């Protein structure tokens, strides 16, 4: 089953980004891909919130979104908009929303990013996604030609409980469109995505933003496809482009037969915490070391 990943350096104009995506979708369809994947914030990357807000709209009034719905229907291809900012009617904050469009031009699924990127990096970069966005509340699974697909976005990948829930639901594919910073990408990107694939025995598809953006932000790139064994099938490096890869969907069954993590999975109760009074009593009565006696956790000569 052939898929196409679009690694982008999105700019501050949604319609320019949408035009780039339309060309890529058409090429993906011509190359025989059944599904096209774009990164997080595919339609807009802009740190200037006031400037960016003038482009915000709900789904029916987003010209960029409607243009992508039309091109998906024209080329009869599944389209995964990794994410885009959506201002739902009456909402004070935006949703960072992943949207899947079916080949008939209907929206098959929506997922709002659950974990918002509020961090202070050692490099000096500070991010407060929650200042403009509201986190989603619900994991989403959608049926696609690739099988059952669990949706997530970028920072979500650091929270394994979400993927445990997806694994319990029997997903075959996980999507993780992203816009990683360079420092966190160099340190964690490949490791996290391979871990999510291995623990779920599922394909992981992660289209990414890359290079230096119009607003000055730099993103890591390295869009990845990882198979259920944890092998990297595609790594797009650090420049924008479109790439296709063929997935052997039978690999899901083979891996799960070899290492049946789903069948062996147990419901884990909360751990028993140590009784602090009992622990203190043990420390208080523990006797002699080479240098003296431990009394209430302190070393005395």
Where are these regions (language model features)?
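Active-site catalytic loop in hydrolytic enzyme cores
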Residues: 89-169, 182-186, 191, 258-261
């Amino acid at each position: 089953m052939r898929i196409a990943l679009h690694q982008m350096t999105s700019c501050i104009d949604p319609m320019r980004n949408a035009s780039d995506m339309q060309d890529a979708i058409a090429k993906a369809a011509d190359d025989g891909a059944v599904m096209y994947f774009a990164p997080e914030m595919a339609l807009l990357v802009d740190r200037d919130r006031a400037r960016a807000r003038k482009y915000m709209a709900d789904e029916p009034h987003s010209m960029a979104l409607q243009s992508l719905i039309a091109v998906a229907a024209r080329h009869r291809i599944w389209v995964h908009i990794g994410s885009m900012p959506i201002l739902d009617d009456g909402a004070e904050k935006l949703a960072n929303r992943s949207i899947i469009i079916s080949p008939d031009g209907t929206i098959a699924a929506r997922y709002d990013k659950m974990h918002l990127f509020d961090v202070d990096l050692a490099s000096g970069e500070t991010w407060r996604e929650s200042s403009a966005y509201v986190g989603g509340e619900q994991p989403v699974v959608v049926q696609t030609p690739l099988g059952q697909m669990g949706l997530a976005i970028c920072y979500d990948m650091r929270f394994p409980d979400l993927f445990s829930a997806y694994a319990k639901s029997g997903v075959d594919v996980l999507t993780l469109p992203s816009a990683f910073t360079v420092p966190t990408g160099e340190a964690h990107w490949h490791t996290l995505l391979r871990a999510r694939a291995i623990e779920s025995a599922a394909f992981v598809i992660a289209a990414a933003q890359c290079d230096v953006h119009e607003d000055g932000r730099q993103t890591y790139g390295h869009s990845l496809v990882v198979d259920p064994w944890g092998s990297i099938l595609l790594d797009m490096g650090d420049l924008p482009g479109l790439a296709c890869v063929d997935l052997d969907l039978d690999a899901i069954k083979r891996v799960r037969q070899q290492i049946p993590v789903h069948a062996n999975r147990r419901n884990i109760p909360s751990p028993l915490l140590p009784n602090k009074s009992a622990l203190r009593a043990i420390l208080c009565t523990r006797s002699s070391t080479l240098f003296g006696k431990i009394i209430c956790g302190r070393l005395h000569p």
